[in-house]
Amino acid sequence: MKILFFQKFFLFFLFFCFFSGCATVNNNVNHDPRDPWEKTNRVIFNFNEKVDRNFLKPIAEGYEKVVPSFVRYGVSNFFMNLGDLLTAVQHFLQLDFKNSGESASRFVINSTIGVLGISDVASKFGFTKTIEDSGQTLGTFGINQGPYVVLPFFGPSSVRDGFGKAIDYMVDPFNSIVKDEEMRTAGNLLRVVDTRSQYLSAEQAFAALAFDKYVGIRNAYLA
């Protein structure tokens, strides 16, 4: 039930952001034509920064300090292995059958020999990891990226990639496999914290650069 509610909320927000952005675009000073909704995006960006600074970042720092590196490595590999399954499907939809087979092979090898993906054995066997999502697949169908948009909690995106994120969430292998709601919620929270911890060191270098952080993240995403 909570998963269904989240999906509806996420899609509702994308529509709201799109139409409210269209209504206010003429009132904003556009510094970048790719970001016509900059005023609204900056409000959401600042909200995300506060949530991260007050909640997510401290938890991620504690996670990195308390949990041994080999355990964190296994957690990251577990979720990335499930991502290989989704990537295989995306490659297939893009008619890229070679990479689809390679990603599927990675999933099978790591799920078995790598013990549920905890160890990335496939890379040692020469199977290259690639990452594809629904936003990229929509792009291969000729759908333009659209304006830049900052999503609450999810961060930088675009209109097309925002819908792609919603699709990815709905077909996420972990959410499909784990039926118990409490375990599913706990697993997703662990995934968020683990992912956030991987950016702690990079964030320090990023913060040391003397420029508008909003612009820096936007340009990096749209590059």
Question: What spans do the regions from the language model cover?
Answer:
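Bacterial N-terminal signal peptides that target proteins for export
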Residues: 1-10
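Bacterial Sec signal peptide processing site at the extreme N-terminus
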Residues: 16-39
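A structured, mid-to-C-terminal "fold-capping" secondary-structure block
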Residues: 24, 28-29, 141-223
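Post-signal-peptide N-terminal segment of Sec-exported extracytoplasmic proteins
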Residues: 36-69, 73
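Amphipathic, well-packed alpha-helical segments that form the structural scaffold of globular domains
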Residues: 56, 60, 64, 79, ...
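Mid-length scaffold segments of soluble, non-membrane domains
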Residues: 81-159
